[in-house]
Amino acid sequence: MTDIVTEETTVETPQGRLFAKRWRAAPAPAPAPAPGPGPGPGPGPGPARHAAAPIVLLHDSLGCVDLWRDFPAQLARVTQRDVIAYDRLGFGRSDRHPGKLDSAFVRDEADRAFAAVLERLGVDAFVAVGHSVGGGMAVGCAAAYPARCRALVTVAAQAFVEDRTLAGIRDAGRQFDEPGQLDRLARYHGDKAEWVLRAWVDTWLSPAFRDWTLDDDLQRVQCATLAIHGEDDEYGSDVHPKRIAARVAGPSSFLLLARCGHMPHRERTDDVLAAVATFLRDAPA
């Protein structure tokens, strides 16, 4: 059995402070050996466990550390790796974002907040795991740090701006116009909730973002890649995981989950955990 130890910290960046949390997959202490009949000392400690590269989670457009809920702890337990998650600037418990997102915000994450988190937490090699737009950011991180990224997992990620993506965002935007709906976001983002919503809806529906794709970054991903996607994802068809798997330079596969929408890690938690654990066990990660 593994005890999961959590640590919370802040990460200073030129734009503001970020909130980060780490789930350490520390092995539970072994019971002390029973004293033997002889006077000699008991057996010494066994060989130290090799520290596998930690998993860094990148959240979706409305997400934050707290909205991962118990998934990071479960992931740490099944993979026997540390898991790190952080709130991007403007989200959750991080500082306010000073302005609007520009059309390069997905790719820029690797060079800005992500890099600061790695430095602050002393992380060298890592596994990038991202949900939705966080999956696109995970691709960018794998592309930016090919010598350090040991493996990449995308969950319900978009590889380009599909009509289904825009339709889903428009529909969600209308739902948030209903009285009380913004309060759902405020529970996690506080008085930043309106900015979080507008950063998602307005950025993705902007004409300046219409031609965005992951193509340039995908071809620079050298590590093993797993693209997980729900067959009923309201924000993207199965073209996305297939495109991700087909265009990365390293070994790749995709997993389509039946009867699953845009939240595979919530809707099909056990399947996602098993897939990631198997993938990381088999990959040179």
Each language-model region and where it sits:
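Conserved HGGG/HGGXW glycine-rich cap/lid loop of the alpha/beta-hydrolase fold
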Residues: 19, 23-29, 47-96
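Active-site loop/oxyanion-hole signature of alpha/beta-hydrolase fold enzymes
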Residues: 85-126
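Flexible "cap/lid" loop of the alpha/beta hydrolase fold
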Residues: 136-144, 149-181
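Short beta-strand/loop motif that positions the catalytic acidic residue
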Residues: 221, 227-229
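Short alpha-helix in the alpha/beta-hydrolase fold that links the catalytic acid
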Residues: 223, 237-246
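Acidic catalytic loop of the alpha/beta-hydrolase fold
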Residues: 232-236
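Catalytic histidine neighborhood in serine/cysteine hydrolases
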Residues: 246-262
